[in-house]
Design a protein with these regions (language model features):
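Short, motif-level signal for alpha-helix interfacial/capping segments enriched in acidic residues
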Residues: 10-12, 235, 348, 403-408
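Glycine-rich beta-strand-to-loop/alpha-helix junction loops that act as flexible
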Residues: 257-258, 368-371, 488
Length: 585
């Protein structure tokens, strides 16, 4: 991961804000410890902290067009950059081997028509440009010649981005809110699948974020009669994983032992021996794939992860942490992940500890299994879905909010140590295949027997299990969903609930809305995390940047209507789903 800071609509001399931009950028240097760069000119400033993964030698940022009239700062990966480079061969003189430079080529093609000189770029043109990108990204582009800017974020929000405003009306964007805290009067998340385009001197008090990412599968009626194919799911995910192995540095996989990470790891192992950039003509820098698991000793995930690693042939690393080590890290974890959401803090802590070990081994990028539960209804509360329509609409809602939760966790807990996380299940092309699959085929369905010969009535993500059963040990292919924060060890969650219930008094909870009028904590654990968050980020904007809603087993609030028992609960653990989880409480 990299980190970016952009400043637009500058009223004073641009150079007067240069030192401020550098200080802001330094706050997110953990995201990109390899190099720093800054552009200061026109009515904009762009700063960049680089984590070099593609083209380490010449891919420093900000990036410039050949005539240096356009400048770009990007946090992201463009997986189809070679295809775009071929398309613009002879039309655009690429300056580096960076995958992100193709964004400049695409933008330049929109402004180079002499007959349209001086005209604004149209919404349709920008949508076409952004839709042509296959990857994860948040970028800020400034056109010095036209005094225009273009800011955009990837469709699902895998890469974080925030936008803020100071009292002078200056506009700021940054990869993390810690760069904006104390600098802006107000700020908010820049919405996934949106862009902002305008003059360097913004006329309104707030950027207009415009949606470019639209899909027919947002609507149940568009998919309800579609076919369902496990083979199509298999082929599309294999293509996604292969695309995302683009790297000029050693990489690995996060392997929890659950279905999703096991599938990603198994596919990655098949391609890891050779470099995908030249169609497997040369061997990879690190031909044997390394896998990583984290948990308390004896945790459910660890034994399963080892089983998968032995089956697929990775070099496996099991990282143990103690409850005390986890507790000691929570204050730092909340600073880096910038949320007080209970599930996210629970799950980010072991991931944060794991990332430190991964970085110490010289690995800069890992693949992870985030997104599958949202796409295929993998959370255990989906067993209660009353209809295919309710099921599908909940998956769409979950995807629309993923940037507040799992995307945030996977990105920021890894980026805290300069490690990039890639998520093949959230690949744009794979999403179209998976979300257009008939929802009936994705609902929790019956199985005749379990691997132990015991009867099982329903299981989640059946179509994914069918698609990849031949690549995994049988007991993994048909293993019940275990949320990451549970799977690292049940005692981790139980201890957090106990300690926070003792640390926060009943009186404090009774007055929670007075201390925290924005998103008042719903329970003592959230109150505990919120208190730490407020020490790091005291502004109202920071508090509003976190999404809050009642939830059972990671459900949205709407899905609480599916089961009468859900209505009086607020517990994000999968063990809260009685009659479904094997160890429900």
């Amino acid at each position: 991961m990299c980190g970016i800071v952009g400043i637009f609509n500058i009223k004073q001399q641009t150079h007067e804000l240069r030192d401020k931009a550098l200080r802001m950028s330094q706050k997110i240097r953990h995201r990109g410890p390899d190099w720093s760069g800054i552009y200061c000119g026109g009515s904009a400033i762009l700063a960049h902290e680089r984590l070099s993964i593609v083209d380490p030698e010449s891919g420093g940022q900000p990036l410039y067009s050949p005539d240096r009239k356009q400048v770009l700062a990007v946090n992201g990966e463009i997986y189809n950059h070679q295809e775009i480079r071929r398309r613009y061969a002879g039309q655009y003189e690429f300056q580096t081997g960076s995958d992100c430079e193709v964004i400049l080529a695409l933008y330049k093609s929109l402004t180079s028509d002499p007959s349209r000189r001086g005209e604004n770029i149209t919404h349709e043109q920008i949508c076409g440009m952004l839709e042509s990108l296959s990857g994860i990204f948040a970028f800020a582009l400034y056109d010095e010649e036209r005094d225009e800017f273009l800011i955009a974020r990837d469709p699902i929000g895998v890469i974080p981005l925030y936008v803020g405003y100071d009292s002078d009306g200056t506009v700021y964007v940054a990869s993390e809110l810690k760069a904006l805290e104390g600098q802006c009067e107000r700020f908010e998340p820049f919405l996934p699948g949106h862009y902002a385009y305008g003059k360097g001197k913004v006329r309104s008090e707030k950027l207009k974020m415009i949606r470019y990412y639209k899909r027919d599968w947002f609507d149940y009626d568009a998919v309800k009669n579609n076919p369902a194919s496990a083979d199509a799911i298999r082929d599309a995910l294999k293509d996604s994983v292969k695309r995302q192995l683009m790297s000029d540095v050693p990489y690995g996989v996060l392997l929890s032992g659950g279905l999703d990470s096991s599938v990603i790891s198994a596919i990655a192992e098949k391609y890891s021996e050779h470099r995908i950039e030249d169609n497997s003509q040369t061997r990879a820098y690190w031909p044997r794939l390394h896998s990583f698991a984290v948990g308390l000793k004896g945790a459910p995930d660890l034994a399963k992860a080892k089983l998968v690693a032995d089956h697929i042939g990775t070099v496996h690393h099991e990282i143990n942490y103690t409850i005390q080590e986890g507790l000691d890290a929570i204050r730092d974890v909340i600073y880096f992940i910038e949320t007080y959401d209970v599930t996210t803090v629970r799950a980010s802590t072991p991931m944060y500890l794991l990332a430190r070990v991964i970085k110490s081994m010289g690995i800069k990028m890992v693949l992870s299994g985030e997104g599958a539960d949202e796409i295929f209804g993998g959370y255990l509360y989906f067993h209660k879905a009353p209809s295919a329509q309710a099921f599908h609409e909940e998956t769409v809602r979950k995807l629309s909010k993923l940037h507040y939760y799992d995307c945030l966790r996977a990105n920021k807990s890894l980026a805290a140590w300069g490690v990039e996380g890639r998520v093949p299940f959230l690949d744009k092309e794979f999403l179209d295949v998976a979300m257009r699959t008939n929802p009936e085929a994705k609902m929790c369905g019956p199985l005749p027997t379990s691997p132990k010969g015991e009867e099982i009535f329903t299981i989640e993500k059946r179509i994914v299990r069918e698609a990849f059963a031949d690549m995994l040990p049988e007991e993994i292919a048909w293993r019940q969903k275990e949320q990451f924060s549970d799977g690292v060890g049940y005692s981790w969650i139980d201890t957090l609930k106990k300690i926070t219930s003792e640390a926060v008094t009943d009186e404090q909870m009774a007055h929670a809305a007075e201390r925290f009028p924005i998103n008042p904590p719903l329970n003592k654990e959230e109150y505990y995390y919120r208190s730490i968050f407020a020490e790091h980020f005291p502004s109202d904007s920071a508090a509003r940047s976190v999404n809050q809603e009642a939830s059972v087993a990671c459900s949205t609030a709407i899905a609480l209507e599916w089961d009468e028992a859900f209505k009086n609960m607020n517990d994000p653990s999968g063990r809260a789903v009685k009659g479904v989880h094997e160890k429900a409480y």
